[in-house]
């Protein structure tokens, strides 16, 4: 899980979602998981 100021899609499987006011990236590749912090 990467914590970044700006989250970006790394590949085409990455999806940007909002969960409880937190912007997250979920992907089939676990290395692409990100959270905005």
From Swiss-Prot:
The keyword Aminoacyl-tRNA synthetase does not apply. Pfam families: Ribosomal_L36. Coiled coil: none annotated. Keywords: Ribonucleoprotein, Ribosomal protein. Disulfide bonds: none annotated. The keyword Ribonucleoprotein applies. GO terms for molecular function: structural constituent of ribosome. One of its GO terms (biological process) is translation. One of its GO terms (cellular component) is ribonucleoprotein complex. InterPro entries: Ribosomal_bL36, Ribosomal_bL36_sp. Belongs to the bacterial ribosomal protein bL36 family. HAMAP family: Ribosomal_bL36 (MF_00251). This is Large ribosomal subunit protein bL36. It comes from Azoarcus sp. (strain BH72). The lineage of its organism: Bacteria, Pseudomonadati, Pseudomonadota, Betaproteobacteria, Rhodocyclales. The gene is rpmJ.
């Amino acid at each position: 899980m990467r914590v970044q100021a700006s989250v970006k899609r790394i590949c085409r499987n990455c999806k940007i979602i909002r969960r409880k006011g937190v912007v997250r990236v979920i992907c089939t590749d676990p290395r692409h998981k990100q959270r905005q912090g």
